[in-house]
Each structure stands twice: as C-alpha cells, then as structure tokens.
Amino acid sequence: MLPFVHEQIGTIIVNFFILTVVCAITLLVCLAVLTAIRLCVQCASGVNTLLFVPAFYIYNTGRNAYFKFQENRPPFPPEDWV
C-alpha cells in the first residue's frame, strides 16, 4: 500500500477515537447534570412533605377551630363590671 493511505487510515482511526472520547465525556457530563437536577427535585419534594404540608395542616386546623369556637363565645360582661 502507498504511504499516504496508511496516513489516512491512521488519521481516521485517531479521529474516531477522539470523537468517541468526546461523546463519552459529553454523555457523562449530561448524566451528572441530570442527576443533580433529580437530586434537587427530590430535596424540594422532601421539604414540601416534611415542612409545608404539616404547616398547612396545622394552619387549617387552627383556623377551623377558631371559626368553630367564634360561634360559641360567651357573652360580654355587663358594663358595670368594668
């Protein structure tokens, strides 16, 4: 074979190897970014479940109790007691 044919084949092999390495690195970076986003979503879901849902429950329960007992208030004392 002619020497320039060997050079072209070697160049093709090297370029294929470089392209494969670049694709693998790009795939790893994308995987790391998607994993970080998934972790952030899981943390936000945990904060929602552990912090906000109980707070909304306590707030709604207290508000309902307040409105329920507003109807059953004792009357005000007479003016001469003051």
UniProtKB/Swiss-Prot annotation:
Primary location: host cell
Any one of the GO BP annotations: viral budding from Golgi membrane
Entry keyword Membrane: yes
Compartments where located: Host Golgi apparatus membrane
A Pfam family per the record: CoV_E
GO CC annotation terms, alphabetical: host cell Golgi membrane; membrane
Membrane topology: Single-pass type III membrane protein
Keyword Transmembrane listed: yes
Intravirion topological domain residue ranges: 38-78
Keyword terms: Apoptosis, Host Golgi apparatus, Host membrane, Membrane, Transmembrane, Transmembrane helix
Transmembrane segments: 17-37
UniProt topological domain (Virion surface) ranges: 1-16
Protein origin, superkingdom: Viruses
Record family assignment: Belongs to the betacoronaviruses E protein family.
Subunit and interaction comment: Homopentamer. Interacts with membrane protein M in the budding compartment of the host cell, which is located between endoplasmic reticulum and the Golgi complex. Interacts with Nucleoprotein.
Task of the protein: Plays a central role in virus morphogenesis and assembly. Acts as a viroporin and self-assembles in host membranes forming pentameric protein-lipid pores that allow ion transport. Also plays a role in the induction of apoptosis.
Identification of the protein by name: Envelope small membrane protein
